[in-house]
Design a protein with these regions (language model features):
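Short, well-formed alpha-helical segments that are part of the catalytic scaffolds
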Residues: 19, 24-39
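Conserved donor NDP-sugar-binding/catalytic core segment of glycosyltransferases
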Residues: 103-139
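Short, flexible, basic/aromatic active-site loop/helix in glycosyltransferases
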Residues: 144-183
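Active-site-adjacent helix/loop segment of glycosyltransferases
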Residues: 219, 223-293
Length: 402
């Protein structure tokens, strides 16, 4: 091997992380911070594509992350085109399509890349996604939405028969939440694949409707003869998740998305029209009124930090007693769990706790009466979401920057 080839091999960029943003400035700051931590030991780049946000996203990026590539679109180009623009500018062997309302652990990309390198004929790798309460998001592994599979989705039959292989194909129930294996469809919130493969299949189809862009890309990769994988050992927080609001607009968008997918990849299906018509009828007949997300009244706050000044600032802001906790997260949460009936909000200080430990805590202590927020390192806000349905909550602070 020539010297120049050796240098190229050593210095070759392994991965480009593409983050498409639109008006989620605070989530974006948290996301980029976590990605930077996860890429510290990897030859890599971060490319943020902003779809003409009206908030302070671009100003924040230039101030906080001047070393990160920022592409400022003059219009909202949409999800497919925005990501395609980012990939076109990338130089990594792999690309990661990542939503801005996500948090990755420090070892996320090391694990994902090691897994990817272990596979032949690799397509796309997705990871395990949880929401801001630690609950599993089933859309991170799915099957090809044939007319019948789409029917089980819109009618909710997959919920009635959660263990059925026949009715559970939409969410790939052949794999457990904590089981790695092949799947057909992965979610656009987190996708890792070879850049060459992304370009080979044409990237995201810019004609796609909402809810079909990631399905289409995943299926194009399958048609190219590659295998897609769900990798459960990497857990990523996706705050907003797939909306569970099942209103008329959702039904229309889902139907349009499936129609686009079938028209592109299959012959015209009478079954599709029949199943979607029945599904729409049952949907309108049996749908329950969507419960309004009620903000929980927090009984007390627990701040995982040793910063006494921070405790005082949070107390003054919230107007409630804040308990400072500086012991191990797991032991402290176990003791808090024993006090049943209280609504306890946990605030994790990322200046002292790793993203990995925070993510582990979210997952381990889900559904135990806690809500969670994160204070990102050297940031002046606390952020989180108590439901994959809502827009999240940001609590602004005034904290002296280091």
């Amino acid at each position: 091997m020539r010297t120049d080839e050796v240098i190229h091999y050593i210095c070759a960029m392994q991965i480009s992380v593409i983050i498409l943003n639109y008006n989620v400035c605070y989530f974006l700051e948290l996301c980029v911070l976590s990605v930077q931590k996860a890429l510290e030991n990897i030859e890599s780049e971060i490319i943020v594509v902003d779809n003409n946000s009206s908030d302070d996203s671009c100003a924040m990026m230039k101030r906080r992350f001047p070393e990160v590539s920022l592409i400022e679109n003059k219009t909202n180009a949409g999800f497919p085109k925005g990501n395609n623009i980012g990939v076109a500018q990338s130089k990594g062997e792999y690309v990661c399509i990542l939503n801005p309302d996500t948090v990755v652990a420090e070892d996320t990309f090391e694990k994902i890349l090691a897994f990817a390198e272990s596979k032949t004929n690799l397509g796309i790798v997705g990871c395990k996604l949880i929401d801001g309460t630690g609950n599993f998001l089933p859309e991170c592994k799915r099957g090809v939405p044939t007319p019948f599979v789409a029917f089980t989705k819109v009618t909710g039959l997959y919920k009635v028969f959660p263990k059925s292989r026949r009715f559970g194909k939409y969410y790939a129930e052949h794999l457990e939440e904590n089981q790695t294996g092949k799947v057909d469809i992965l979610v656009g919130a987190f996708m890792v694949m070879k850049r060459d493969l992304y370009l080979e299949v044409g990237g995201f189809d810019e004609n796609c409707f909402m809810y079909s862009d990631d399905i289409d890309l995943s299926y194009m990769v399958l048609k190219a003869g590659r295998s897609n994988y769900y990798f459960h050992e990497s857990v990523v927080v996706h705050y907003k998740g797939e909306s569970t609001v099942r209103d008329g607009l959702y039904m229309k968008r889902f139907r349009d998305a499936m129609h686009f997918f079938y028209s592109k990849h299959f012959k015209k299906s009478i079954l599709f029209d029949v199943f979607m018509s029945i599904g729409a009828f049952l949907f309108s007949l049996f749908k329950k009124s969507q419960a309004v997300t009620i903000k929980r009244k927090i009984d007390r706050y627990s701040l995982f930090s040793t910063d006494k000044n921070l405790v005082l600032k949070v107390e003054n802001l919230l107007g409630k007693k804040v308990v400072m906790t500086d012991s191990t997260v797991e032991n402290s949460l176990n003791s808090l769990t024993n006090k049943a009936g209280e609504n306890i909000e946990i605030i994790f200080d990322n200046n002292q706790l790793s993203f990995k430990s925070i993510i582990n805590s979210l997952e381990r202590f889900r559904n135990k009466g806690f809500t969670f927020k994160i204070l990102p390192q050297k940031s002046d806000f606390i952020i989180g979401s108590n439901s994959s349905n809502d827009r999240g909550e940001v609590i602004a602070l005034k904290i002296d920057k280091v």
